[in-house]
């Protein structure tokens, strides 16, 4: 009996950002998470911040700039060109993002960008935090069951 092991396939599988149970548990313990998504809404990267996104110190705008840094059309729509991005403390890859985003413009594009931004803020714990942080559990369950 011979075992045919393809190192390239194994390497590709490990590099494809498989979400392990330890990663899921870590996300469920984190307080401030920002999800980056594919154009179809599937989460691709969970960015973990140790501090809360706030309007008064403009950190929410800096996080938005980081979230959309590869999408100049969204940065322009949301007037984030002069904002410095705030890097996350840690990022966990959830799935591969190999899709192209549609070009957003005009009032509809602005609404879509804001909707994507407002749905990005998540929390893994159930402590009192601002209203714009939604529970992460639903997203994690969708990822694990796919």
Swiss-Prot record:
Task: Output the InterPro entries linked to this UniProt entry.
Answer: Pox_D2 (IPR006791)
Q: Does this UniProt record's set of keywords contain Acetylation?
A: no
What is the first-listed, main subcellular location in coarse terms?
Answer: virion
* Location of the protein in the cell: Virion
Query: What keywords is this UniProt entry annotated with?
Result: Late protein, Virion
Q: Name one Pfam family in it.
A: Pox_D2
**Entry's induction text:** Expressed in the late phase of the viral replicative cycle.
Q: Which GO terms describe its cellular component?
A: virion component
State the similarity comment.
Answer: Belongs to the orthopoxvirus OPG114 family.
What the protein does comes down to: Late protein which is part of a large complex required for early virion morphogenesis. This complex participates in the formation of virosomes and the incorporation of virosomal contents into nascent immature virions.
Q: How does it assemble?
A: Part of a complex composed of the kinase OPG054, OPG092, OPG100, OPG114, OPG115, OPG142 and OPG157.
According to UniProt, the name of this protein is Core protein D2
| Gene name tied to this protein | OPG114
